[in-house]
């Protein structure tokens, strides 16, 4: 997912690598991977985002995700 971020490319790539390795280690199917990642995202929203900002942030996240998967 393309991003403009305060995080370095290296830091981002390292986190992505670790997530992918974990999914591969458990031989997670596409559906299981999406379920697990969805639950991780939900947990992040519930634990790290103020309740008053969750809906707006979730909408923005969804828009970025759709833009990313529809990019040609």
From Swiss-Prot:
Coiled coil feature spans: none
Domain of life of the source: Bacteria
Gene3D superfamilies reported in the protein's UniProt record: YejL-like
Family note: Belongs to the UPF0352 family.
HAMAP family xrefs: UPF0352
UniProt protein name: UPF0352 protein Patl_3379
